[in-house]
């Protein structure tokens, strides 16, 4: 028996008839997957929207010679806050993947349904695309002004599709002369591997040093740390952020914004890195004899006692009991 009574929101807060009717419709199994996908898209939107906005200030400020508009430090914080908002607002509905590599890892290691995984990944990429479109339109006047300034200076071709050009606000590019593809691969792989270890640790119910309420901050700090240390050599960390934003850059600037071979690194390397990190954590760091921390147990009980889940489980149990009580023909 739970140490505290199980009280659902509807027990203490009454909603209007319209909202109750809408909840009954949206929570049907045939429809609820769309709500989960909406939450995944919205979560990635938060992450990308705040990160790109800060990146736009950095890139445009440098082109227009306006100092103090942004910095790598600020960009790291912007992405970190976006992650906090994503987890805080959306994770209760979808589970809080917000990254295709996390969804793929959950599918392989934790039985996440493959069809649902495909839907999640599409939603994540869509969220990044929508965020890119909004950031572009909010910054459009200054982006166009920056492009004109680059053309007047005769450096448009050499700057536009680099981290220092307006297209670099959205799509990820190698810094010319500063990075090779093998080193970019190493940079991406190591950072994604470390980040995935942190995520897996935050999800470990025996991690008493990382209670559930702190997990969003730990994960956000890991993202920020990677950006602060390795954004300049070039880093992606999230396929949805990369693919969604690159598709938007292609929408605006055409094939020139594709990014060449480096785009494969930014879009794909985080997937094997995350899978390897999950294997390493499961093999070397998980200990089934450790005690489940009280805060994690409470979190697990809250998830398990979701009203619809409990009713479904009770219906299944009644069905099993009815089946077992019937005499089977010999």
From Swiss-Prot:
Keywords: Membrane, Repeat, Transmembrane, Transmembrane helix, Transport. A motif (NPA 1) lies at residues 99-101. Residues 62-71, 146-157, 205-207, 286-330 are extracellular. The chain crosses the membrane at residues 41-61, 72-92, 125-145, 158-178, 184-204, 208-228, 265-285. Induction: Expression is induced 2-fold during ectomycorrhiza formation. GO terms for cellular component: plasma membrane. Its main location: membrane. GO terms for molecular function: glycerol channel activity; water channel activity. It is a multi-pass membrane protein. Residues 308-330 are annotated as: Disordered. A motif (NPA 2) lies at residues 238-240. Belongs to the MIP/aquaporin (TC 1.A.8) family. PANTHER family: AQUAPORIN 3, AQUAPORIN OR AQUAGLYCEROPORIN RELATED. Water channel-like protein that does not show transport of water nor ammonium across membranes. This is Aquaporin Lacbi1:307192. It comes from Laccaria bicolor (strain S238N-H82 / ATCC MYA-4686).
